[in-house]
């Protein structure tokens, strides 16, 4: 006689950027995989923003998640900004309607638990969970907790963080609920696809010149793009440069995009090939958003980090970069240090294979042996049962 499967329902909440979505989908995939091995059936729903870019990013991601998620549910989503804006007042109405939508959706779905991956869209579902007495987990990907995590942490069953030191940023009364998990990364980043990356880039295996991957993000990073353009002669002489510029920079600088050759390969954006391209790289020059940072870290790639530190940022990228710098796992260029001379100094150091190996060894220690996605999925499944 076949044993009846236990059936659970889990709701995921998060959005705003791919950094809140892709890691969550990785957890959803792993949770489904783990459930099968435990003879458990899980129905997963995702709550995200109903409007603008947020919805399109989430829905595009859900299409490629392998069927792990049953449905996407859009809610109104406001935002509390760190500066004065009239929209702070109008967004209060969005937050209210987002809460009402979350409350009735969760009451209908009756989930066993909710997993919050962050972004302000996760706040109202977590508040509704608290009212409905639905247990929820919240995960913080950055070194310092963001506003959404701080708001969600009080009622959370478990607070999952990427770094042990992050615990110190929470109230002492909450620290017993904290679990250090690392930041979840899609499994494809753990696979050795460097040959596929070289093939995509048109770089033969016989070419021994170090590959420098420059990540400006999907929207681009003007500071990083300018550093590359200003030092292109030096870079091409010493490296094969793979430059993801972002669409805006590509549209505004067609001559640069057309100037590609065997030593300089500009791309507006690299899509599904990104995991294999990172694996093919020897050095990465990048911002220090949590998602891209950990994608490079789990592949043990030496990094030069140029964190975003404008007035519109809470400084999370600086904190992330400083952590890796202090662990001897990356160079950091911030403020007055983000100059051509400093960049070249860092690159000259990383031309030494021994130095690159030192950074790689430090990254392996940071990331640990257990995959964060497995640790998180295990915690969620264990708490449900």
What is each residue range found by the language model?
Residues 327-334, 338-355:
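C-terminal "capping" alpha-helix adjacent to the active site of nucleotide-linked donor transferases
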Residues 81-113, 131:
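An amphipathic, basic-hydrophobic alpha-helix
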Residues 6, 38-43, 67-70, 130-195, ...:
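Active-site-proximal region of nucleotide-activated glycan assembly enzymes
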């Amino acid at each position: 006689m076949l044993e009846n499967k236990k059936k659970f329902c889990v709701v995921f909440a998060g959005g705003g950027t791919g950094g809140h979505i892709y890691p969550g989908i990785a957890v959803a995939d792993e949770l489904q995989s783990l459930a099968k091995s435990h003879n458990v059936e899980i129905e997963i729903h995702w709550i995200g923003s109903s409007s603008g870019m947020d919805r399109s990013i989430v829905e595009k991601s859900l299409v490629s998640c392998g069927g792990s998620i049953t449905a996407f549910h859009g809610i109104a989503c406001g935002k509390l900004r760190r500066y004065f804006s009239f929209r702070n007042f109008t967004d209060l109405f969005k937050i209210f309607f987002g809460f009402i939508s979350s409350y009735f959706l969760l009451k209908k779905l009756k989930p066993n638990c909710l997993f919050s991956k962050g972004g302000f869209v996760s706040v109202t579902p977590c508040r509704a969970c608290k009212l409905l007495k639905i247990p929820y987990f919240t995960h913080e990907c950055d070194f310092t907790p963001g506003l959404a995590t701080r708001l969600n942490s009080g009622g959370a069953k478990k607070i999952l963080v990427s770094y042990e030191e992050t615990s110190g940023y929470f109230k002492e009364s909450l620290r017993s609920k904290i679990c250090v998990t690392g930041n979840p990364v899609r499994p494809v980043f753990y696979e050795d696809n460097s040959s596929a990356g070289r093939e995509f880039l048109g770089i033969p295996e016989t070419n021994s010149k170090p590959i420098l991957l420059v990540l400006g993000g999907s929207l681009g990073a003007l500071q990083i793009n300018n550093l590359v353009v200003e030092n292109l002669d030096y870079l091409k002489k010493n490296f094969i440069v793979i430059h993801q510029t972002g669409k805006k920079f590509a549209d505004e600088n067609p001559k640069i995009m057309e100037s590609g050759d065997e030593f300089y390969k500009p791309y507006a954006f690299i899509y599904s090939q990104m995991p294999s391209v990172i694996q093919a790289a020897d050095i990465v020059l990048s911002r220090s958003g949590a998602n891209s940072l950990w994608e490079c870290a789990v592949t043990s790639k030496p990094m030069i980090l140029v964190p975003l530190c404008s007035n519109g940022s809470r400084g999370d990228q600086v904190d992330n970069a400083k952590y890796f710098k202090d662990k001897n796992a990356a160079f950091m260029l911030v403020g007055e240090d983000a100059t051509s001379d400093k960049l070249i100094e860092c690159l000259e150091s990383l031309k030494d294979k021994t130095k690159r190996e030192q950074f790689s060894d430090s990254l392996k220690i940071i990331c640990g042996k257990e995959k964060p996605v497995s640790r998180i999925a295990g915690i969620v499944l264990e708490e449900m049962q």
